[in-house]
């Protein structure tokens, strides 16, 4: 048998109660079934690292928080570049963290939070590791020689 509610049901838990009786007035014990409606993916916020971070360090810790009011628990995976997504432990408060080792150049960190209903939220961060020191190409002083107490200009050309 099917039932269509007269109006859309809100996200959350719902219970359907069933009563049955026959023409002779014999009533069955009431039965019920509970279910959840979940149309909203979990929230996901990343507190560290910031997007487009440029650093000279290869060690970084991804930290964040997730929550889903309807379909707990929420699972979190973190993927670095083209590696495998790894499950991360999520605390009772929704907080999580994972240490990563970045490579020189551009790194893509993908964090996915997925609730028990299969809804997911994805946040991506790009972190650039720059370990190349700048190069001083030239230094000029004008005028040269410099007179004491006079104004002079020092020009420096640097590449990075």
What does each model-found stretch correspond to?
Residues 1-3, 94-98:
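Short strand-edge motifs at loop-to-beta-strand transitions and within beta-strands
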Residues 6-13, 99-106:
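Surface-exposed, short loops/turns at beta-strand junctions within beta-sandwich domains
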Residues 22, 31-42, 125-134:
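Flexible, low-complexity linkers/stalks enriched in Thr/Pro that connect modular domains
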Residues 27-30, 120-122:
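A structural signal for beta-strand boundary/capping segments at domain termini and interdomain linkers
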Residues 51-58, 144-150:
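Short, solvent-exposed loop/linker segments at the N-terminal edge
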Residues 67-76, 159-160:
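Extracellular acidic loop/turn motifs
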């Amino acid at each position: 048998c099917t039932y269509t509610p007269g109006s859309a049901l809100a996200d959350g838990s719902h219970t359907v109660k069933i009563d049955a009786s026959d023409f002779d007035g014999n009533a069955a014990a009431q039965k019920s079934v509970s279910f959840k409606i979940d149309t909203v993916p979990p929230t996901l916020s990343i507190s560290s690292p910031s997007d487009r971070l440029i650093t000279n360090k290869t060690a970084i810790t991804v930290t964040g928080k997730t929550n889903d009011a309807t379909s707990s628990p929420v699972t979190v995976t973190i993927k670095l570049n083209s590696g495998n997504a790894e499950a991360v432990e999520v605390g009772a408060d929704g907080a999580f963290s994972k240490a990563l080792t970045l490579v020189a150049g551009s790194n893509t960190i993908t964090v996915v939070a997925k609730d028990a209903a299969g809804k997911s939220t994805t946040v991506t961060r790009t972190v650039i590791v720059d370990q190349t020191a700048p190069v001083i190409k030239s230094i000029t002083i004008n005028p040269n020689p410099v007179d004491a107490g006079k104004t002079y200009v020092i020009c420096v050309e640097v590449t990075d």
